[in-house]
Amino acid sequence: MAATPISATGIPSMGRLPTVADLMPRLRRHGIELPAGVVRVGAFGDSAQLSEELLALIRAGRKRGGASLVWGHEADAEPIPSVGEIEIVVNHLNEPSLVTRTTAVEVVPFNRVSAQFAAREGEGDGTLEYWRREHWAYFSRECQRIGRVPSETMLVVCASFEVLNLVPEPLAPLSVNTLDTEAS
């Protein structure tokens, strides 16, 4: 789900996410073409660490849902996802990481998010208790960013998705020590 763009330092960036046009050449280099339909760009998390953790859960097949605040969408003039939308998900460096299709969207008060959705999000132990604790902390930071006060009844966008494409992760650069070992 879209979140505040984050800089390479892990500090929330006030800059914009890249555009679909910016990302398409990179996707095409990996042989990825997008299906017809509405395409947008989004990110998960509000720090480099959280972004990487959530993307790893998606890549592992554990995470198939994301939650965001209606207030955040309003503050950022960002539409609420709709079923069938394609999303290019970027990492904390604004590099494309994966492509998803939204399969379900429900807007509910924070205190009405279901255990089934919490499990679909795939974070922590998958329980509603874990979801509420961690998302309360996350949404509290989001509320601070947009000048709102968190509430048990704040509206949450619960979106489910399927992964269409995983963008290959770049290989780590070889170190001098690695080259010396390989030459032996």
Task: Please tell me what each predicted stretch does.
Residues 2-99, 106-184:
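Mixed-charge, low-complexity intrinsically disordered regions
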